[in-house]
Amino acid sequence: MLSIDLTGKRALVAGVADDGGFGFAITKALAEAGASVCVGTWPPALGIFETLLRRGKLDASLALSDGRKLEFERIYALDADFDTLEDAPEEVRAQKRYRDRGDFSIEGVANQLREDFGEGSLDVVVHSLANGPE
């Protein structure tokens, strides 16, 4: 583990939908270093991820080395294929796994972060999208 102190810092890890990928491991490492962590999850996977969390199916994976439980400060619907909501075709926006998720675009998540935490409140951004644009 890196010896780094991120206490008081906020991170957004894009590409977390379960406990099996690099994004989840990076999220844990950031939390271990003291950061508050938000994640962006692909809208079609978000409901499943929320259910796994709610039912405690990820509890063992959420355990940090100091005994704390990893807590996501926020979980945002994020589809990085779309810079703005207008870029998403209507047939995508109308799909049941998208339509009630608000603005799931990159711009939408950035705006939501500003609304939730204020301007300049994000210190670390991690791109960990399995199939997303770079």
Region annotations inferred by a language model:
Residues 1-134:
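Short-chain dehydrogenase/reductase
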